[in-house]
C-alpha cells in the first residue's frame, strides 16, 4: 500500500500543478468573482469568501478536481496533509480582488499564494520531498511573475488606464482549519466510499485508499479464465463426490467385517465430501449475483454471515481432515508392512476427529472472503495467527509424518522386491506399490493446496500491484476512469487453477488408489447388507456362485474333459455327446473310482507275491504306497500324490470311456510313472519297499 500511496501523491501533485498553471492568466478582462460555494471542500480552509474564476472555469469544475485530491491527502501524516491541503486550496481558489482603481473596463485580479505557505509544506513534508520536490517548487516563475510571491504581485495596467505597478497582496489560508474537518465523501467510480468505523467493525472490505473500497464483486481474472475454472470445478467436484460416496459404501456399509484400513478410507471419503459441500455453498446463488457479496456495498462476506461460517467450517474440516487421515493411512500401511497393528486405533481416530472439529470451531469468528478468494476461509488478520495456528502448523506436522512413512514404505517395498523375485504371485508387492503411488499423488495434491495460500500471502506485492495501477488510473482519469482504465488482472492464473483442481480431485484420486481392487468384488459378493438390498428389488446375488473345492478333491472340469477327449478317439459321435452331457457326473465318478482303485491296490499289497505281481498292479501299488507314504512324508511326496492321483483319474476315465484301451492305459501309467520318477527320486525306493512287504 505504501507504493500506492506514493503513486497517488505523484498524481495529486501533478493535478495540483495542472490546476495552478491553467488558472494563471495574468490579465483576464472577462474573469469574475464569485462567492465560494458552501459545499466546496476548501470552504473552511480559506480566510476569504470571494474567489477568482478565470474565463471558462466554474466552481463545480474546480471542486470535481479538488475533491479526490483532498481525499488522497489523507494518506499523509496529519501535519503534512493539513498544510498540503491549505496550499492546494489557496492555489485553486484564489482570492478575488475587485474595484481596481482607474481601469476600464472593470475586471478583477487574483491574489497569488504566499511563498511562506509553500515553504511550510516543504518543511513539514520533508520525508516525502523525494517525490514532492519536482512539483512543490516555491521559487517557480510564470509569465515573469513569481508563482509564490513573498508579499504580492505587481500588475501593469497602463493598457487599461491604470497604474504601471498595481500591487496585489498575496493570500493565505485559514490557519484555524486543520485536518479534523469533515472528510470528503468522494471516491472515483467504481470505488465506494465507506466510513472508517464501518470498515473497522465489519471487516471484509477491500480498502484501496482511505475510505475508498473496491466494489463487490471485483473481477481479477478474465471472463474466459473464470468460466474455465468454474466448469472444471463443477465437473470434478461432482465426480469426486460420487467417488467418495462409493468409498464410504464399499468400505463402511457393505463389508461384513471391518479393518483399520476400511475405517480410514471411510474417513477420507467424508473429508472429501466436506470439501465438496464447501464448494457447493460458495457456488450457490442466493437471490442472484456473487455469493461472496453482501447487501452492504463493497463488503465481502465474513463471520457475520451464516453462509460464510458454514462454508469455512466445511472447508476447514475437509482440508485439514484429509491431510491428517492421509498421515494415519500411511502410518497404518507402515505397520502392516512390518507385521504390526495399531492397538489404539479407536483412540487415535476419536482424537483426530476431535482435533479437526476443534480447529474448525475455534476460528469461527475469523472466517471471511476477499477479492482473491473463491469462498470463505481463515482471515489473515493478527499477522496470520489463525491461519498458522488452526491450519498450517497441524497440516505441516501431519505432512511431515506422511512423508516419513511414505519414504519408509518405499524402502520397505524395495526390499520386498528381492523376496518376490522367485515367486510368481506378486500381487501383494503390486498392491503395496500402488498404495505408495496413491500416497505420493495425494500428497502432491495436499501439499500444493496448502502451499498456494502462503504463496499468495508472501507474494502479495505482485497481486496488489494490479490493484494499484487500476486505482491510480481511476484517479488520473476522473470522472471517466471506469471507462478508460483496464480491468484488474491478477498474475499466475495457472497456479490458481491448479490449486482448485488439486482440491477437486481428492475423491477421484481416492477411488483410483483405494477403490479399484479385485477384493472389492468379494466384498459385494459376501455382503449380507448388499444382498438384502438387492433382494428388496428381486435380484438374487451369489446364490449360484461356485464354491471352493475341498483339499483332496479332483481336478477341475477342464482337466477332466481333456482326459476324456484323449481316451474317446475311437468312439462314435453318440458316445461323445453322452460324455459331454455327463461331464458333470464324471467328476463324481472319478472320485468313486479313485477310492475303488485305492482299495484294490491295498488288497494287492496284502495278498500278492513277487511271482504274480505284474507291471500294472505294481504301478497301482506304487500309487497307493505313495499316497500312504505322503501321509508320513508330506514334504517329499506331495508332487507324487498329485501325479499318481492324476494317473488313477486317467485310468478311471479310460475305464469308464473305453474298456478296450488297456494298452494305452498301461502306456499312460508307465509315462506317468516315469514322470513320478523325474519329480521324486524316491519311487524306486518305494518299489523295493513294496516288494519287501509282499515277500
UniProtKB/Swiss-Prot annotation:
**Regions of compositional bias (Low complexity) in chain numbering:** 593-608, 626-686
The residue stretches assigned to a coiled coil in this entry are 653-691
Q: Name one GO cellular component term.
A: membrane
Residues on Cytoplasmic side: 255-262, 329-343, 409-435, 522-695
The reply to whether Membrane figures as a keyword in the UniProt entry is yes
**Keywords tagged on the record:** Coiled coil, Disulfide bond, Glycoprotein, Membrane, Receptor, Signal, Transmembrane, Transmembrane helix
Statement: the UniProt record of this protein carries the keyword Metal-binding: no
Segments of skewed composition (Polar residues): 545-556, 609-625
Q: Which residues lie on this side of the membrane: Extracellular?
A: 24-233, 284-307, 365-387, 457-500
InterPro entries under this entry? Frizzled_dom, Frizzled_dom_sf, GPCR_Fz/Smo-like
Q: Where is the FZ domain?
A: 28-173
Q: Which PANTHER family match?
A: FRIZZLED AND SMOOTHENED-LIKE PROTEIN N-RELATED, G-PROTEIN-COUPLED RECEPTOR GPCR FAMILY PROTEIN
Q: What is this protein called?
A: Frizzled and smoothened-like protein O
Q: Which organism is it from?
A: Dictyostelium discoideum
Q: Which gene encodes it?
A: fslO
Amino acid at each position: 500500500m505504501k507504493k500506492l500511496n506514493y503513486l497517488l501523491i505523484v498524481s495529486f501533485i501533478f493535478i495540483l500543478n495542472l490546476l495552478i498553471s491553467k488558472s494563471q492568466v495574468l490579465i483576464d478582462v472577462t474573469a469574475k468573482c464569485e462567492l465560494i460555494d458552501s459545499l466546496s471542500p476548501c470552504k473552511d480552509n480559506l480566510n476569504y469568501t470571494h474567489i477568482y474564476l478565470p474565463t471558462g472555469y466554474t466552481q463545480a469544475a474546480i471542486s470535481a478536481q479538488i475533491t479526490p485530491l483532498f481525499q488522497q491527502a489523507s494518506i499523509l501524516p496529519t501535519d503534512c496533509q493539513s498544510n498540503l491541503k491549505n496550499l492546494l486550496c489557496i492555489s485553486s481558489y484564489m482570492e478575488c480582488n475587485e474595484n481596481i482603481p482607474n481601469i476600464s473596463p472593470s475586471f478583477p485580479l487574483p491574489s497569488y499564494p504566499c511563498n511562506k505557505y509553500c515553504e511550510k509544506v516543504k518543511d513539514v513534508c520533508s520525508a516525502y520531498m523525494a517525490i514532492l520536490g519536482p512539483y512543490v517548487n516555491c521559487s517557480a516563475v510564470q509569465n515573469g511573475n513569481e508563482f509564490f510571491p513573498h508579499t504580492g504581485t505587481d500588475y501593469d495596467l497602463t493598457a487599461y488606464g491604470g497604474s504601471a505597478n498595481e500591487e496585489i497582496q498575496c493570500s493565505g489560508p485559514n490557519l484555524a482549519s486543520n485536518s479534523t474537518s469533515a472528510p470528503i465523501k468522494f471516491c472515483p467510480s467504481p470505488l465506494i466510499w465507506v466510513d472508517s468505523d464501518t470498515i473497522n467493525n465489519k471487516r471484509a472490505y477491500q480498502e484501496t485508499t482511505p475510505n475508498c473500497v473496491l466494489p463487490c464483486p471485483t473481477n481479477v481474472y478474465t471472463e474466459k479464465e473464470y468460466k474455465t475454472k468454474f466448469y472444471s470445478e463443477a465437473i470434478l467436484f461432482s465426480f469426486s463426490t460420487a467417488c467418495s460416496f462409493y468409498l464410504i459404501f464399499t468400505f463402511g456399509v457393505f463389508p461384513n467385517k471391518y479393518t483399520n484400513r476400511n475405517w480410514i478410507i471411510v474417513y477420507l471419503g467424508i473429508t472429501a465430501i466436506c470439501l465438496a459441500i464447501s464448494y457447493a455453498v460458495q457456488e450457490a446463488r442466493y437471490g442472484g449475483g456473487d455469493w461472496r457479496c453482501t447487501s452492504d456495498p463493497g463488503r465481502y462476506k465474513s463471520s457475520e454471515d451464516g453462509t460464510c461460517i458454514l462454508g469455512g467450517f466445511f472447508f476447514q474440516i475437509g482440508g485439514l481432515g484429509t491431510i491428517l487421515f492421509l498421515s494415519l493411512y500411511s502410518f497404518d500401511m507402515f505397520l502392516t508392512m512390518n507385521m504390526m497393528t495399531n492397538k489404539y486405533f479407536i483412540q487415535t481416530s476419536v482424537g483426530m476427529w476431535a482435533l479437526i472439529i476443534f480447529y474448525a470451531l475455534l476460528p469461527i469468528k475469523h472466517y471471511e472472503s476477499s477479492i482473491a478468494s473463491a469462498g470463505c476461509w481463515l482471515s489473515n488478520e493478527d499477522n496470520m495467527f489463525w491461519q498458522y495456528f488452526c491450519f498450517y502448523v497441524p497440516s505441516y506436522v501431519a505432512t511431515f509424518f506422511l512423508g516419513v512413512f511414505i519414504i519408509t514404505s518405499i524402502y520397505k517395498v524395495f526390499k520386498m522386491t528381492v523376496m518376490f523375485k522367485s515367486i510368481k504371485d506378486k500381487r501383494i508387492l503390486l498392491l503395496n506399490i500402488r498404495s505408495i503411488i496413491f500416497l505420493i499423488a495425494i500428497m502432491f495434491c495436499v501439499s500444493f493446496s496448502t502451499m498456494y495460500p502462503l504463496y499468495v500471502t508472501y507474494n502479495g506485492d505482485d497481486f496488489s500491484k494490479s490493484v494499484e495501477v487500476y486505482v491510480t488510473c481511476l484517479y488520473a482519469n476522473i470522472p471517466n476512469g471506469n471507462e478508460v482504465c483496464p480491468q484488474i488482472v491478477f498474475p499466475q492464473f495457472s497456479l490458481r487453477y491448479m490449486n482448485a483442481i488439486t482440491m477437486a480431485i481428492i475423491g477421484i484420486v481416492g477411488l483410483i488408489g483405494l477403490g479399484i481392487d479385485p477384493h472389492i468384488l468379494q466384498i459385494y459378493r459376501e455382503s449380507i447388507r448388499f444382498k438384502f438390498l438387492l433382494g428388496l428389488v428381486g435380484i438374487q446375488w451369489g446364490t449360484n456362485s461356485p464354491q471352493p473345492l475341498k483339499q483332496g478333491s479332483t481336478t477341475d472340469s477342464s482337466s477332466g474333459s481333456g482326459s476324456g477327449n484323449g481316451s474317446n478317439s475311437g468312439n462314435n459321435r453318440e458316445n461323445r455327446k453322452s460324455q459331454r452331457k455327463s461331464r458333470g457326473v464324471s467328476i463324481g465318478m472319478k472320485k468313486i473310482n479313485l477310492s475303488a482303485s485305492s482299495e484294490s491296490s491295498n488288497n494287492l499289497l496284502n495278498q500278492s507275491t513277487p511271482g504274480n505281481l505284474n507291471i500294472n498292479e505294481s504301478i497301482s501299488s506304487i500309487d497307493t504306497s505313495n499316497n500312504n507314504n505322503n501321509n508320513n512324508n508330506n514334504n517329499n511326496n506331495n508332487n507324487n500324490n498329485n501325479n499318481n492321483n492324476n494317473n488313477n483319474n486317467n485310468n478311471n476315465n479310460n475305464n469308464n470311456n473305453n474298456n478296450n484301451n488297456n494298452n494305452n492305459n498301461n502306456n499312460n501309467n508307465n509315462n506317468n510313472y516315469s514322470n513320478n520318477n523325474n519329480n521324486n527320486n524316491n519311487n524306486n525306493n518305494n518299489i523295493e519297499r513294496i516288494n519287501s512287504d509282499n515277500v
